[in-house]
Structures are given as C-alpha cells and as structure tokens.
C-alpha cells in the first residue's frame, strides 16, 4: 500500500461517520474534561485545552485510528498532590517530561509488551472501567428531582430505540440525537436541572503557547520525575489496553509502539499549551466506534469541535443537561462491560476467573488502573507457571544388564518444575552408568540448571557415571554458562560450602 492509499484509508474512508461521531465525542468530552480538571485541582480550561491538544495531535501521530485520547480521570488522580504542593507550572513541566518518557518507551518498543497481558486481564480491565464509568455518573443521579431520572431514562430510550427508526436511524448517531433532543426539551420547558455550565466556567479564548515557569534545576527534576514516571506508566497502560479493545471492536490491528510515541508527543504539546497530561479514553473510544467513527479524522474532528464549541458556542454548550450526558455514559458503561465474561464463568477455568475478578476488584477499589493490571498480570503469570510446571514427565528404563539406566525428560524445566525434576531420579540405585536424555526437554532459568547440577553431582557421588545428552541449543547455552557439574573446580568449591 503506497502513501496516498494509506492516507485515504486512515483519513478519508469514512468521512460522514467520522464527522458525526467526532461531534458526539466532542460534546461528551466537555463535562468530563471539566470534571477531571476539578479532580486535579486546576482551572477547567486546563483539562479542556489538554483534551483539544491531545485529540488533535494523536490524530496525526497515534498508532490506532479511531481511538480517542484526551484528559482522563486516571491521570488526574495522579496529579492532585503535585498541584497542591507545587502549583500548575510544575504540573505542566511534569506533563512534558511524561511525554518524553512515553516517546522513549516507544523507541524501546515497550508497546510490544502488551502480548504478555492475558485476555483475562484485558477482560477484567474492561469490566472495571465499565463499573467506574457507571459509578462516576452516580453523583449526577443522587439527591436530584424526578425530572433528572425521567430525562436520563428518556435519553437511554432514544439511544437504544432511535437506530430502529427507518431511513435515518442508522445515519445519525443516537447519542447525538439524545443530546440535541434533551437539550431542546430542557430549554423549552425551562427545567431547573444541572447543566454543563454548572460544572465550571468554559474558556472564551484560544490556547496559547507557553513554557512552564519553573527553574531548570536538578531539584525541579527530582520533584516532577516521580509524577511524570507514574503518569507515563498509567497513560501507556490505559492507552495500550484501549487500543486492544478498539482492535477487537473494529477487527483491525494497531501499532502499539507508534501509539507510545504519539501519546508522548501529544502530552508534550499539551504541556506547552497549558494543558494537563492525558491518554486514551476507553469510554470515548467506545462512543466513537459505536457512533460510526473509524479513522483518524474522527479524533481530529473531536478535538477541533471541542475547542470550537467551548470557545465560540459556550452559551449553547452550557445549556446541555448533565442528564443527557449521563445517559450517554451509561450507554458506554453497558456497551463496554463484557457480559460474556459473566455468562461464561462456569465454562472458563477457575484460574481465568480469579485473574479477571481480581483485576476488577483492585481497579474498582483503588481507582488505579496500573495496580489492577499489575495484580492481574502477576496472578496470570503465577497460574501459568503452576500449570506449565505440571507438564514435565520423566520416564526411565534399565538395560538388560542392569548396570545402566536411562532417564528421558519431556517438558519444561524451570523454577516451578525443578523440584519435580530432581524428585524423579533414584539416587540410591546401584548402577554403573546413568544417561539423562534431554532431547525433548527445555531448560529455562538458573533454577533449572541448579536442579540438573544437583542431580548429576548426587549421582556421581553415589559412584555412577553420568552422561547428559540431547540438550537443544538454547538449553545448552544456559547450562554451559551457569552449570557447574562439568566444572571440577566449581564442584569442589560448591562441596566445600
């Protein structure tokens, strides 16, 4: 595929769907950007400018067309202490350093590490985010009049029923119809309900380039680096997970390492325009895909429309009832949750269910995506090690003379299976020679090598001649490097201890 064809496919292959979905996303981004600014303890314009800049930049630099990136709650939570103790300028500097670290991660190809995240962890991550998205709407549904419940229910009805309207149901995104209808209804009837303008003051000027006013000293670096590192890790985790989810929704693939670099460039740009750090947003990405967005154009439209709406149409945007946006986000929550993971609980292995539920529990309890993913990956690794450790078989046969025994090892020898490997040998049997056939085995780590050393040395101590044969190239390399059973000096030193 040449450059012109690639540009056509990534930008202009779905123009109508991208324009409409981008507008829906822009409207949904506004209250969230304001809310995340409040969480971080900064002016609402910081979150709005960040969402504009990140969405526009990532449209050009990202590795996952159709995925929406902007200011997020997960990132905002990490900024609270920095803003409180040092102020906005240090936040902008930390945002830029976060971008540098993410670009470095892209060049180091850390995005490829996503292949080590199991499907059960991704499912747990998705379900946890769906729960968090729903929980985030509860304050808008608590201690309110019945009008809010009625409008939210009406909004959900529009979202789910409008697609069945002949001719136009599949042309216009139902979330956009929901927002427009409920806004018009609230303005005509004059309902006293919370609107976007109640979330905070919308900016009336375009963002301008500025350099953070912080001293360029080692002390400043020591202050911002821990926050920048945390932001970079959480941002990349959420972005990589979201990219995987959008891959599944669209049956396409993405360039994870390019996405790392793109997120970094976007965050540097955000910091230079007075915005906070951000990353991919699973909720908005799902809205975009469900509304028909597929290419980079949808993300660009979302960012540009966001800025135009808040700067030039703030009076109209401010009248959007929060109930309409709550309805949209509830739809996102329902659509994001993997209901198959609940229906198939009895069919899936217990280990898979434990990993999924643990990931959900940790993310929901801590509101920290990184903790949940870390726990999920560690549990998945432990279960895998335990499972693969059982796939080790050692058989033996004795020659007719009774003076020689051959042990045939089949499977993986590593820290989890090393005890089973050692326990498979009879060290007290009176034989002249023992052959250990490793042609169908693989040694993975120094624990496995130490187990082989232990077996060979104990057999030789009992007076048997030991021959190790059949090691594959990779196993032979690690055994030659770390093994001591064929190194007399090392064996003597080991025995002395």
Task: Tell me what each language-model feature is.
Residues 3-5, 298-316, 427-448, 490-497:
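Contiguous hydrophobic segments
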Residues 1-16, 194-210, 391-408, 463-497:
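Intrinsically disordered, low-complexity non-transmembrane regions of multi-pass membrane transporters
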Residues 140-141, 183-186, 232, 399, ...:
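Glycine-rich loops and low-complexity Gly/Arg-rich segments
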Residues 1-383, 387-392:
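Transmembrane helical cores of multi-pass ion-transport proteins
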């Amino acid at each position: 595929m040449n450059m012109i064809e690639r540009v056509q496919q990534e930008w202009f292959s779905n123009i109508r769907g991208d324009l409409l979905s981008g507008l829906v996303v822009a409207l949904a981004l506004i209250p969230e950007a304001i809310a995340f600014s409040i969480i971080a303890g900064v002016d609402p314009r910081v979150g709005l400018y960040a969402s504009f800049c990140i969405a526009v930049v990532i449209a050009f630099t990202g590795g996952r067309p159709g995925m929406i990136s902007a200011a997020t709650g997960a990132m905002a939570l990490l900024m609270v202490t920095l803003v409180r103790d040092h102020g906005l300028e240090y936040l902008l500097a930390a945002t830029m350093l976060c971008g540098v670290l993410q670009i470095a991660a892209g060049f180091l190809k850390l995005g490829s590490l996503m292949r080590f995240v199991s499907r059960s962890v991704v499912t747990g991550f998705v379900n946890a985010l769906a729960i968090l998205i729903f929980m985030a709407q509860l304050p808008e549904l608590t201690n309110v009049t019945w009008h809010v419940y009625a409008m939210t229910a009406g909004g959900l009805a529009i979202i789910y029923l409008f697609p069945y309207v002949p001719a136009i149901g599949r042309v216009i995104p139902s979330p956009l119809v929901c927002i427009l209808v409920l806004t018009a209804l609230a303005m005509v009837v004059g309902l006293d309900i919370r609107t976007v303008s109640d979330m905070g003051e919308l900016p009336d000027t375009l963002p301008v380039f500025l350099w953070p006013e912080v001293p360029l000293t080692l002390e400043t670096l020591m202050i911002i680096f821990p926050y920048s590192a945390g932001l970079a890790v959480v941002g990349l985790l959420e972005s990589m997970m979201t990219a995987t989810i959008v891959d599944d929704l669209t049956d396409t693939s993405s360039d994870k390492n390019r996405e790392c670099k793109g997120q970094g460039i976007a965050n540097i740009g955000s910091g230079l325009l007075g915005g906070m750090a951000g990353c991919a947003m699973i909720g908005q990405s799902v809205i975009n895909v469900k509304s028909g967005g597929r290419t980079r154009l949808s993300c660009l439209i979302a960012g540009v429309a966001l800025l135009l709406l808040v700067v030039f149409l703030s009076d109209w945007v401010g009248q959007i009832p929060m109930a309409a946006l709550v309805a949209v986000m509830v739809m996102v929550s329902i659509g994001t949750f993997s209901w198959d993971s609940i229906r198939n609980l009895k069919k899936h292995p217990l280990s898979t269910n434990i990993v999924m539920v643990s990931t959900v529990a940790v993310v929901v309890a801590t509101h920290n995506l990184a903790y949940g993913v870390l726990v999920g990956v560690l549990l998945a690794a432990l279960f895998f090690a335990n499972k693969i450790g059982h796939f080790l078989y050692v058989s033996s046969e004795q020659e007719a003379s009774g003076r020689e025994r051959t042990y045939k090892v089949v499977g993986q020898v590593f820290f989890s299976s090393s005890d089973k490997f050692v326990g498979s040998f009879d060290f007290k049997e009176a034989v002249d020679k023992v052959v250990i056939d490793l042609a169908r085995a693989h040694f993975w780590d120094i624990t496995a090598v130490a187990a082989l050393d232990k077996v060979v040395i104990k057999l030789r101590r009992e007076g048997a001649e030991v021959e190790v044969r059949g090691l594959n190239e990779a196993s032979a390399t690690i055994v030659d490097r770390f093994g001591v059973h064929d190194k007399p000096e090392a064996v003597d030193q080991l025995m002395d201890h």
